[in-house]
Amino acid sequence: MAAAFRKAAKSRQREHRERSQPGFRKHLGLLEKKKDYKLRADDYRKKQEYLKALRKKALEKNPDEFYYKMTRVKLQDGVHIIKETKEEVTPEQLKLMRTQDVKYIEMKRVAEAKKIERLKSELHLLDFQGKQQNKHVFFFDTKKEVEQFDVATHLQTAPELVDRVFNRPRIETLQKEKVKGVTNQTGLKRIAKERQKQYNCLTQRIEREKKLFVIAQKIQTRKDLMDKTQKVKVKKETVNSPAIYKFQSRRKR
């Protein structure tokens, strides 16, 4: 019963409002509330406890304690500084190693490029997907001719040979001359399978050559960044391209 009376009394009590900053003190900023004071007080208390712990640690320090890090640290102006260790690899050696890496990758890329050229010459790469397809445009005078247009009839060849861009004989040539090479279905399938296998190999080699080219560019970019010339990054590094930097122009002697 008492709880019910307390709730009823709260519903009728005056609404509590925090005091705001007076008008003549607006230039001093917002009036500090209790929550602001609490944050400031907690921060001050935390710092005091940290200083107290440091003082206690300094008083309890053992003058005979030893750490292995002390052998490579020296005290200079009250600050601990790690001694400089001897370089196992000089910058010139590192630059030479990276140059050899670039040369090796470039050698592999050139080898892949030569294999690609050899495969292209063997396959007579005229209808390869990676190559830009040529367009054959036909012109007509009326819409009726466009609707009745048939590519095989216009080119005077068999419908099966329309998609070819090379070795597309006419019907009269097929009727007059004897077909050379394999004519049975099994032999044709075997030749088509071998040809497709070579095209797949060529596609893989082209992709590998592109990846090697990108890797060589990235290593070369890292080698160029070793120069102390002032530089600005223009483009970030991506999977398919290295980062691009603009170097400060320097007059050559």
UniProtKB/Swiss-Prot annotation:
Q: Which UniProt keywords apply?
A: Isopeptide bond, Nucleus, Phosphoprotein, rRNA processing, Ubl conjugation
Summarize the protein's role. Answer: Part of the small subunit (SSU) processome, first precursor of the small eukaryotic ribosomal subunit. During the assembly of the SSU processome in the nucleolus, many ribosome biogenesis factors, an RNA chaperone and ribosomal proteins associate with the nascent pre-rRNA and work in concert to generate RNA folding, modifications, rearrangements and cleavage as well as targeted degradation of pre-ribosomal RNA by the RNA exosome. Involved in nucleolar processing of pre-18S ribosomal RNA.
Pfam families noted in UniProt: Utp11 (PF03998)
Q: Where is this cross-link: Glycyl lysine isopeptide (Lys-Gly) (interchain with G-Cter in SUMO2)?
A: 74, 83, 86, 103, 120, 143-144, 180, 211, 218, 235-236, 246
Residues bearing PTM Phosphoserine: 241
Database matches in PANTHER family: U3 SMALL NUCLEOLAR RNA-ASSOCIATED PROTEIN 11, U3 SMALL NUCLEOLAR RNA-ASSOCIATED PROTEIN 11-RELATED
* Region (Disordered) location: 1-26
Family, as annotated: Belongs to the UTP11 family.
Residues with the Phosphothreonine modification? 90
List the InterPro entries.
SSU_processome_Utp11
The GO biological-process annotations, alphabetized, read as: nervous system development; positive regulation of apoptotic process; ribosomal small subunit biogenesis; rRNA processing
Subcellular location(s) of the protein: Nucleus, Nucleolus
Q: Does the keyword Ubl conjugation apply?
A: yes
Q: Describe the protein's quaternary organization and the partners it interacts with.
A: Part of the small subunit (SSU) processome, composed of more than 70 proteins and the RNA chaperone small nucleolar RNA (snoRNA) U3.
Q: One GO CC annotation, please?
A: cytosol
GO function term, MF aspect, one: RNA binding
Q: Which organism is it from?
A: Homo sapiens
Q: Give me the disulphide-bonded residues.
A: none
| Protein's recorded name | Probable U3 small nucleolar RNA-associated protein 11
